[in-house]
Amino acid sequence: MLQPFHVQTSSEELRTAVRRFESGLYGLAGQQVLTILQKNPEDQEALYFLRLVERRLTRAKPQAKPTLIWQFDPKAAWERDWVEMLLGGVVEKTVVDNTWSQLAETMIVVDNRLIEAKTPYYRRAFESGCRVILVHLSDEAFKDDLSAYRYCDAVIRNYRSELLAESARIQFIPLGYKAGLATPSAPKPASARKYLWSFAGDAKKLTRAEMLDAMAKIEGGHQHLTTGFASADALSTPAYRALLDDTVVVPCPGGWSNLESFRVYEALEAGCIPIVEKRPSFDYFTALLGPHPMPAVMSWMEGADLVKRLQSENALEPLRQSCAAWWTAYKPKLVRDLTEFVERNLKTT
């Protein structure tokens, strides 16, 4: 099992120090690791563990409110508005670095496409005594290098991982909606929306062709197919929001590597009913979000039948309202949960 935060050693002396640390005997653990380093000053795992002990011994000290540091241009980030909504209230200021050089006493670093070459920045922050929470974005295929995790106090990331979920120091967040999509307007009722269902995007991914074949049999739908993700023929953000505002049901098939997509939360933000996918013994969205009212289907024939049934039973508007109410309540709860997670791991209160 992947254990990105654990001390990795075959040394029985260091294992003894780790056991003392796990028992809350931080002073004894520190003495043990100093003894190890007297024998071998270049023992990298012992040096790493010494930093952990030192950080725990100084954990009661009051810490500054964290600085939010972007390591890529937030203007180009689909998650910009979402990240700022979730974390804006917990940070002192925001800095755009993009050079992996700036440090702060307490810092929340937003990064993506993690590779091994980025790890020295996080190690330098760790060895400088910085408190670090990493916001790790865009690892849809779970291919990023996670070696930076061990130098962070905690990690917030999108794309829930079954393996990483076992760590209490990792908090998962939904993908959220594309920057510029959220508006303060009240959602229209189902009866005032032009389209029973709609889909805008690339149809070539996994189950999307199956979804379109099934949904095309339902009258009142609308398709805007594109050549790829964020391609030139994609709708502008305002045009896509306008389409969603006029749509009741938004089928949300998975992407190349993951069941999750921005489409789910963009549909919720516009007051639509998202239909998501699930797998046998794998209900991704319940694992990520907890109980929710969004319909989850095993096949898109099932999804199309569901839409027909909801329409015939006049149940579209009640379900739409249920999804909208859940999403309205979920967002501030997520903000509270993240604030508590940040404060607990950075000891900012």
Describe the function of each predicted region.
Residues 305-326:
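Conserved donor-nucleotide binding/catalytic region of nucleotide-linked donor-dependent transferases
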Residues 49-50:
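Canonical tetratricopeptide repeat
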